[in-house]
Amino acid sequence: MVRITGDFQQERVLHPAATSLLTEFFSKGWPDPAKLNNSSRQASILQEQVRQSFAKALNVRGDEIEFLGEPDLGFQLAIQGLLTPDNKLFYSSIDRQRVFAVAAYEKNKGRDVTQLQVNNLGQIQESSITANDLLIWQVANGETGNTQPSPKSGAMVFADCTSSGVDLLPNFDYQTALFDSTSWAGPAGLGILIIKSASKWRNPLPHNDLARTPGTYSLPLLLASAVALENYLAQADNRSKLKQEIISFISAQITDVDIASAPNGLGKFLSISIKGVEADRLLLDLEETGFAVDSGSACKSADMQPSHVLAAMGRPIAGNIRLTIHKEMTEQIVKEFCIALKASVAKLRGN
């Protein structure tokens, strides 16, 4: 088995600072914070401290935060929780598959639903949206890293921050937002739902109490996510520079490559399509040289399938690989990857 020296895959191991404390978190976080006994009271104190830590990092109030044990459930809660019978729903052709599913469900129920198109940079083209409508707004795309300008319509907004995380917080008003713990090297299975307009939001799930969410998240994983976030924010960030180095190398050294990622997008994501090679063969060949990359859609339900994001942008789909540049990446690893990529492409093209 070849040792992976450069891991550019989107999935990431838990931040080492959180990993080292996992046993402690599970020893402290097992009680139910809602109960009255001493151990539960201690757990409740920990939970509140974590809530305030997240509130500061995400630039929200503590009472606007809901923790989720299933991040994908947050899309349904954030979107359907704002909808009333007379709202129109607008989403974009580059949104996540979970958004597509909610939009299709609402359309099947008879709601007026519109899919907004994007240009070749992946920027959403707003059209005919009023203040009474709900607009789903992806802060940054999880494949290309391309970011959106602030929405102009004045509609209610659900901000999808699952890819952007704390690397780019919304600079516009929104009613709900969703974050994924994995975006800052936290544990999987933890989402953070923000409900800023509580008066406009109603729990769309079957329920018989005033709880806004199921509350089935793991407190130990919540503690781990908070530590991961704190350490993630403290790390130096050289990713934009490394991304530009890769783009510059490819542009100068490898022909017939379409780079879908804008240079001014998030530094952590890069999507390229290379003419004359099969993506899966390129992925496996790079792995043989010690480099792991992704291919296909970033949406879990469509892994290794052609990217609907690139198709919506009018970009080539064949020969596409995706890189996630992590904070611990070094210039040396990037240089070695570029050399390996050039060699693999030449090999697969038969040059």
What are these regions (language model features)?
Residues 1-351:
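Pyridoxal 5′-phosphate
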